[in-house]
């Protein structure tokens, strides 16, 4: 498993597509940017944003 990392902008969106796949995701910029851009997050944090 990858270590937690900072994901911002297009890197964050690409990671969500990779993690969520066909399920898609809901994009709440404030929540996910606070969680994954300002602080490092891991795959489990990203899965919380999948549909």
Swiss-Prot record:
Q: Which Pfam families match?
A: Insulin (PF00049)
The record's annotation in InterPro entries points to:
Insulin, Insulin-like, Insulin-like_sf, Insulin_CS, Insulin_family
Please list which residues make up the signal peptide: none
Q: Which Gene Ontology biological process is one annotated for this entry?
A: glucose metabolic process
| Keywords annotated in UniProt | Carbohydrate metabolism, Disulfide bond, Glucose metabolism, Hormone, Secreted
Q: In which compartments does the protein localize?
A: Secreted
Output the superkingdom of the source species: Eukaryota
Q: Which cysteines are joined by disulfide bonds?
A: 8-37, 20-50, 36-41
Q: Name one GO cellular component term.
A: extracellular space
Main localisation, per the record? secreted
Task: Please name the Gene3D superfamilies in this protein's record.
Answer: Insulin-like
* GO molecular function terms attached to this record: hormone activity
What quaternary arrangement does the UniProt entry report?
Heterodimer of a B chain and an A chain linked by two disulfide bonds.
**Protein role:** Insulin decreases blood glucose concentration. It increases cell permeability to monosaccharides, amino acids and fatty acids. It accelerates glycolysis, the pentose phosphate cycle, and glycogen synthesis in liver.
Give the record's family classification.
Answer: Belongs to the insulin family.
Q: What is this protein called?
A: Insulin
The gene that this protein is the product of is ins
């Amino acid at each position: 498993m990858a270590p937690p990392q900072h994901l911002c902008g297009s890197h964050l969106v690409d990671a969500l597509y990779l993690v969520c796949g066909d399920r898609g995701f809901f994009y709440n910029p404030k929540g996910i940017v606070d969680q994954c851009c300002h602080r490092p997050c891991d795959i489990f944090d990203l899965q919380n944003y999948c549909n």
